[in-house]
């Protein structure tokens, strides 16, 4: 379906990026660590981020300086030859996009319901800053909501 092995899921705060990754991850418990990267790996894919049942999981649980270990993570990904999923703010930057050339999936949902459901205390300033960053990134595929994103990823990883 796509010729790139790295997928980046982006979207507004509360749009369901972390939920999508939790669904793909399934019940697998453990995680692996490579430098500042934490990830889960199964027979089909690698899911970057720490998913431990917190309100803010996934890439939000990674170090702010995770990008310093990106080259090591890229080496690992290449050695495993699996689809690798990244999501969120930590990876919505020029360095990541240039080095990884990811297939970018943008969730178009405003995220308002998701933020309300989780009792988010993110400031309007933080929410608007991320909305601006998301709007400036060109996507390979846009989806209406997290359910459609999950369906697309499941088709990609088989």
Predicted regions, residues:
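Conserved nucleotide-sensing/catalytic segment adjacent to the nucleotide-binding pocket
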Residues: 37-90
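Conserved glycine(s) of the Walker
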Residues: 14-16
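Conserved phosphate-donor/acceptor-positioning beta-strand/loop module used by diverse small-molecule
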Residues: 87-88, 99-116
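A conserved segment at the C-terminal end of the G1
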Residues: 18-30
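Phosphate-binding P-loop
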Residues: 1-4
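Hydrophobic anchor at the beta1->P-loop junction of P-loop NTPases
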Residues: 9
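Well-ordered, non-membrane alpha-helical segments in soluble/globular domains
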Residues: 63-75, 120-135, 150-153
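NTP-dependent small-molecule kinase module
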Residues: 135-158
């Amino acid at each position: 379906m796509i010729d790139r092995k790295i997928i980046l899921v982006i979207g507004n705060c509360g749009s369901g990026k972390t939920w999508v990754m939790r669904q793909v991850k399934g019940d697998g418990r453990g995680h692996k660590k490579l430098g500042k990267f934490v990830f889960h790996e199964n027979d089909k894919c690698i899911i970057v981020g720490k998913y431990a049942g917190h309100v803010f999981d996934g890439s939000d649980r990674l170090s702010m300086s995770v990008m310093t270990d990106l080259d090591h993570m890229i080496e690992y990904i290449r050695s495993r030859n699996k689809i690798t999923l990244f999501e969120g703010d930590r990876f919505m930057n020029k360095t990541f996009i240039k080095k990884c050339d990811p297939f970018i999936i943008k969730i178009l949902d405003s995220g308002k319901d998701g933020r309300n459901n989780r009792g988010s205390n993110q400031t309007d300033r933080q929410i608007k800053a991320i909305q601006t960053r998301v709007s400036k990134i060109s996507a390979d595929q846009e989806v209406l909501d997290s359910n459609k994103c999950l369906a697309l990823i499941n088709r990609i990883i088989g």
